[in-house]
Amino acid sequence: MSEKHPGPLVVEGKLTDAERMKLESNYLRGTIAEDLNDGLTGGFKGDNFLLIRFHGMYQQDDRDIRAERAEQKLEPRHAMLLRCRLPGGVITTKQWQAIDKFAGENTIYGSIRLTNRQTFQFHGILKKNVKPVHQMLHSVGLDALATANDMNRNVLCTSNPYESQLHAEAYEWAKKISEHLLPRTRAYAEIWLDQEKVATTDEEPILGQTYLPRKFKTTVVIPPQNDIDLHANDMNFVAIAENGKLVGFNLLVGGGLSIEHGNKKTYARTASEFGYLPLEHTLAVAEAVVTTQRDWGNRTDRKNAKTKYTLERVGVETFKAEVERRAGIKFEPIRPYEFTGRGDRIGWVKGIDDNWHLTLFIENGRILDYPGRPLKTGLLEIAKIHKGDFRITANQNLIIAGVPESEKAKIEKIAKESGLMNAVTPQRENSMACVSFPTCPLAMAEAERFLPSFIDNIDNLMAKHGVSDEHIVMRVTGCPNGCGRAMLAEVGLVGKAPGRYNLHLGGNRMGTRIPRMYKENITEPEILASLDELIGRWAKEREAGEGFGDFTVRAGIIRPVLDPARDLWD
């Protein structure tokens, strides 16, 4: 064994309270149904506060008015975030019309938020509208099962590959993996869809009675696009094609970005290559990875419970051998693959079937009618006439997919009139933020509300140094949990306190290297001053085609993170 830190396969010790909660929940039922009828509070109480996450919801409140309400002796304005399960981000126009109506009529904020996990969220659902939202989703063939908490979350799939045929095949696998790893409990159907309690005993053959130790994220990726940021995910199937046809996958396991400020036992980690598998073994291997993590993941410390930590504790080879044993296969050597970028191709792209795909840039993924830019109304109008489907991308954008030549002009006219095709700089197209304030309870600094004006300033710096036609992959995340995927950016800002961020440099354009902290706890003017100097140097000193992140490493501005489990904090 050449492992650096082989440790115990199972961590002994006192289990976390989350483990007690799951065990006592009667397969995720808890007392959610009773709590729904409690009109004294706008929120869910006790264990239910966490159990609703397994049903795709987070309880939040509006932090902009929290102090004011406390002064008035009122409880926080509780409202739920709901995240839909949408493998591969594909949504029909009929489904879109239904979610548009619900967002407008039944949420506080009236918006649809596209996320970088290729689905949509509603923010601001009051308790009385919680059951109706699940029933609305069900009526159009959608659900929110397992999009949060200790399960396999929404499965991602490259949205707009160069080979349309490959997308169809890869997308089918994303759906199959998602379905295969879903919880089997009937709690969701009983509570939200009023389905009868059946006398049979619940069983969870894959996830187990206490589900997974921590969240688990899966992707299907079609090189050379890495739009789904595979290294942020626990389990990744990299599509290998021969003559444009999918033949199998390379498996990479153990990526993840979440850290805790100052806690050196936490680290972001890129995924490890396990090997190649033919298509027919895909579901067996997916199940084997999940059950190995189920059995070996750390249930005594939630900050050390993700797959990345299990791999480092037991060793990559040990984990891989166990997956092979459980799946009954031997991995073949990794097949060659490479990534060239991860941005979306904004605008019209022709597919191989003579249909067109229109990728619309949606800043921060927030779909709402703004003054002079009625984005939400425009998309609704397109949904009413478009015969194909919509695809949400992992960059929080939206693709109008499968447009015949004869419909192009009509759809483009609506898109332009609604501000959906306004020209933006390459820099803005390659920047991203998580939601953060006012709804996220974990937020330490602004992200979504900060990004637009911050990018205005970056655009000015790019123009000043003569590189306006270039871009730097730039991301802002409001806290170190890392939903904005700043820990795979060339320039990553991680929220530390209101108005203050840690500045990370040295990632790359392809998303295969973790950036290192360059400056800690600094303000926007300090960030801009640093970037002004560094962008100026990059513009003058870079080699042909050299991205900003690679330049900062080559020029010795920042040391590259080579082995994140051991050198991220050095």
Swiss-Prot record:
Subunit and partners = Alpha(8)-beta(8). The alpha component is a flavoprotein, the beta component is a hemoprotein.
UniProt-recorded name of the protein: Sulfite reductase [NADPH] hemoprotein beta-component
Q: Which NCBIfam families match?
A: CysI, PRK13504.1
- Catalysed conversion reaction: hydrogen sulfide + 3 NADP(+) + 3 H2O = sulfite + 3 NADPH + 4 H(+)
Family according to the record: Belongs to the nitrite and sulfite reductase 4Fe-4S domain family.
The scientific name of the source species is: Escherichia coli O6:H1 (strain CFT073 / ATCC 700928 / UPEC)
One of the entry's Gene Ontology molecular-function terms is: sulfite reductase (ferredoxin) activity
GO CC terms of this entry: sulfite reductase complex (NADPH)
Q: Enzyme class, one word?
A: oxidoreductase
Record keywords, A-Z: 4Fe-4S, Amino-acid biosynthesis, Cysteine biosynthesis, Heme, Iron, Iron-sulfur, Metal-binding, NADP, Oxidoreductase
HAMAP family xref list:
CysI
Q: Which EC number(s) does the record attach to this protein?
A: 1.8.1.2
**What Pfam families does this protein map onto?**
NIR_SIR (PF01077), NIR_SIR_ferr (PF03460)
Cofactor binding annotation: Binds 1 siroheme per subunit.
Q: Which domain of life is it from?
A: Bacteria
Per the UniProt entry, what are the Gene Ontology biological process annotations, in alphabetical order? cysteine biosynthetic process; hydrogen sulfide biosynthetic process; sulfate assimilation
- Cofactor(s) the record lists: siroheme; [4Fe-4S] cluster
Q: Where does siroheme bind?
A: C483
Q: Which Gene3D superfamilies match?
A: Sulfite Reductase Hemoprotein, domain 1 (3.30.413.10)
What InterPro entries does the record tag this protein with? CysI, NiRdtase/SiRdtase_haem-b_fer, Nit/Sulf_reduc_fer-like_dom_sf, NO2/SO3_Rdtase_4Fe4S_dom, NO2/SO3_Rdtase_4Fe4S_prot, NO2/SO3_Rdtase_4Fe4S_sf, NO2/SO3_Rdtase_FeS/sirohaem_BS
